[in-house]
From Swiss-Prot:
Source organism (scientific name): Dictyostelium discoideum (Social amoeba)
Enzyme class per UniProt: transferase
Protein's name according to its UniProt entry: Probable serine/threonine-protein kinase sky1
Gene: sky1
Lineage: Eukaryota, Amoebozoa, Evosea, Eumycetozoa, Dictyostelia
Entries under InterPro entries matching the protein: Kinase-like_dom_sf (IPR011009), Prot_kinase_dom (IPR000719), Ser/Thr_kinase_AS (IPR008271), SRPK (IPR051334)
A GO CC term assigned to this protein in UniProt: nucleus
Compositional bias annotation for Basic and acidic residues: 383-401, 413-440
Superkingdom, taxonomy of origin: Eukaryota
Length: 656
């Protein structure tokens, strides 16, 4: 595989996801839009693991405004015609009133810019362009360093009304070879929508895309439909003016788990919900580890998506009930307008996985202290600083009321470091989320900057088009027939094989395993470590490990210090067995740059003292997490071990 990492689409904006990235309530990398499931059926005769085909549709000139009327009549007679000339402009369907508007970007911070629309770069896309003879462009979803992503209608999968009934119920059918694509004879009222990722055409990007497709095909090969893993629907190549581009088609999903964390105002979810989501995540990990022989390498809340779209930006409008799942809280409707005004219009953040730079390797769900505070920190153990600050947080843990818990006694240090961009939030919201906010440093790159400065060891940040979210249906329910939300693991762009690693720079900072930090031998257990970190975050709203750099030490030093404080001194495998162990440890196993680690704060104490878990809750949760946090990868619990743990015994069996 090329040194360039594949698209990491984990940036959240509004709730729609692109292979793990959220925007406006719809998602790429999973299964459903508005509750319509694609299931495991092969679409339009295209096998999920089928061979690559080539489309040679050439995009139109941007000066084609006057051709629209002429094309409309012609194209309506040629929809999905197998004899279409791929080089003809008429290989697209123009609905009445549609626009052939160019999506070429401007040179500003709101899009990817025009400089990389050249040989080896992005492919120019226009509304109503058709790719692979079936995917018609509707709108732009987002972009990153490696690719652009587009919302498309799948013209081979129309949604029809029954011709024998006046019922308004719609059915999704694979089209026959007739021109209208309505094989059942009903009236076509729409088309299944998918997300199309078009990769830049340079060889390095193409090689990375080939690796990703192989991994995604392996997942689809073993019938992943019930394994809580998102699947690739289709892939092909397209030749345009800038070269040959790999194109990947994904299903549409809902919000990611980071949105759910935000919905609960970073105070933790009901433990029953945490168990449900973790069981599905572990089902997915067990499947890819044991059956597919794949390591995800970037498990985090942003990369687990719900199957239904959900509007989390009016947080108090929806509350959790074990009996009913999420339902509309009618008593809060009078406060809806004020709540919306208090929420930021867009909680845009940045994703920097696999980047070992201290300024940019954080998950975008992480918010650290301001740059000024970091400059004032001395060479002392940051975990003690975190403890002093966070003990004042005094979160009351209640299984059924965690979405309305109050946070008291925020320390003055925390309130002095408010995000400068939080003017739209009220003071209480700022205090509640202070430990999650980060003022970007001057070295943090935007998506536009990444497109020009990211090296071959970087990964992709996605930015999203404003105003897309209104197009997607918002469901008022987030549960299935058993009242529990369904979720899927997404974003295999950084995955690798168990016997073939593409890079050792893996995992987002907060979820990174110790063996990955010291560059020791690693495998599937790195995903289990990340799963433990994610479970803690879902239950508490905070990261289990939130390292910071300071005077005389880097984030990796602090990260290891936090692990030692929680789990004790690491074994020789960690302090001496990695290629970079000596960078962080002495020959005796002490940290070089943070030697004073006399205090311990074990997990049970963290749960009871800081998050106010009951004694029994803390014991049970600790018993589940600690085997997943074993320093030694070979002794760490497997996904199957975790699924068999008593902590998950009360999760509904339908998830199996």
């Amino acid at each position: 595989m090329s040194d360039i990492q594949q698209d990491s689409t984990s940036t959240t904006l509004g709730g729609t996801s692109l292979g793990g990235t959220s925007l406006g309530g719809t998602s790429l990398g999973g299964t459903s839009l508005g509750g319509t499931s694609l299931g495991g059926t092969s679409l339009g005769g295209t096998s999920l693991g089928g061979s690559t085909t080539t489309s040679t549709t050439t995009p139109k000139s941007t000066n084609s405004k006057n051709k629209k009327k002429k094309q409309t009549s012609s194209n309506n007679n040629n929809n999905n015609n197998n004899n279409n000339n791929n080089n003809n402009e008429n290989n697209r369907d123009n609905d009445a009133g549609s626009s052939n508007k160019s999506f070429m970007p401007l040179n500003n911070n709101e899009d990817e810019g025009t400089k990389d629309y050249k040989q080896g770069g992005y492919h120019p896309v226009r509304r109503n362009d058709v790719y692979g003879n079936r995917y018609q462009v509707v709108d732009k979803l987002g972009w990153g360093h490696f690719s652009t992503v587009w919302l498309c209608n799948d013209k081979d999968t129309p949604i029809t009304t029954s011709s024998s009934s006046s019922s308004t119920t719609t059915t999704t059918t694979s089209s026959s070879s007739n021109g209208n694509g309505n094989g059942n004879g009903g009236n076509v009222i729409g088309y299944k929508q998918v997300a199309l990722k078009i990769v830049r055409s340079a060889r390095t990007y193409s090689e990375t895309a080939e690796d990703e497709i192989k991994i995604l095909n392996a997942i689809s090969k073993y019938n992943a439909q019930d394994k809580c893993v998102a699947r690739l629907l289709d892939h092909f190549t397209h030749r345009g003016p800038n070269g040959r581009h790999y194109c990947m088609v994904f299903e549409l999903l809902g919000n990611n788990l980071l949105d759910l964390i935000k919905h609960h105002r970073y105070r933790g979810m009901p433990i029953t919900l945490v168990k449900t989501l973790m069981k599905q995540t572990l089902i997915a990990l067990d499947y890819i580890h044991t059956k597919c022989k794949i390591i995800h390498t970037d498990l985090k809340p942003e990369n687990v998506l719900l199957e239904k779209s959900f509007d989390f930006f009016t947080s108090n409008d929806y509350i959790w009930s074990e009996k009913y799942g999420y339902f509309k809280n009618r008593t809060s409707s009078s406060n809806k307008q004020s709540q919306q005004q208090q929420q930021p219009q867009q909680q845009q953040s940045q994703q920097n996985i696999n980047d070992y730079s201290d300024d940019s390797d954080d998950s975008h769900s992480d918010y650290s202290d301001s740059e000024d505070e970091l400059k004032n920190k001395g060479n002392k153990k940051s975990s003690n600083r975190d403890r002093d600050n966070n003990k004042n947080k005094n979160i009351k843990k209640d299984d059924n009321k965690s979405s309305v818990n109050e946070i008291n006694n925020i320390s003055k240090e925390n309130t002095d470091n408010k995000d400068l961009n939080s003017s739209e939030e009220n003071k209480k919201e700022e205090e509640q989320q202070q430990n999650k906010k980060e003022e970007p440093t001057t070295t943090t790159t935007t998506a536009t900057a990444t497109a020009t400065t990211t090296t071959t060891t970087g990964t992709e940040e996605f930015k999203f088009v404003n105003g897309i979210s209104y197009k997607f249906k918002k469901n008022n329910e987030l549960f299935n027939e058993n009242h529990y939300p369904r979720a899927q693991l997404v974003d295999l762009g950084n995955a690798c094989w168990t016997d073939k690693h593409f890079t050792d720079d893996i995992q987002t900072r907060q979820y990174r395993a110790p063996e990955a930090i010291v560059k020791a031998k690693w495998g599937t257990p790195v995903d289990i470590w990340s799963a433990a970190c994610m479970a803690f975050e879902l239950a508490t709203g905070d990261h289990l490990f939130k390292p910071k750099s300071g005077k005389g030490f880097e984030k990796s030093d602090d990260h290891l210090a936090l692990m030692i404080e929680l789990l004790g001194k690491p074994p020789r495998f960690i302090f001496a067995g990695g290629d970079e162990s000596r960078v962080y440890f002495t020959h005796k196993g002490d940290l070089r740059k943070i030697p004073d680690l006399s205090d311990q704060w074990p997990l049970f104490s963290v749960l009871t003292e800081k998050y106010k878990f009951s004694i029994q809750e803390a014991k049970d949760f600790e018993a589940f997490l600690l085997p997943m946090l074993n320093y030694l990868p070979e002794k760490r619990a497997t996904a199957k071990d975790c699924l068999n743990h008593t902590w998950l015994k009360d999760v509904p069996p339908f998830l199996n």
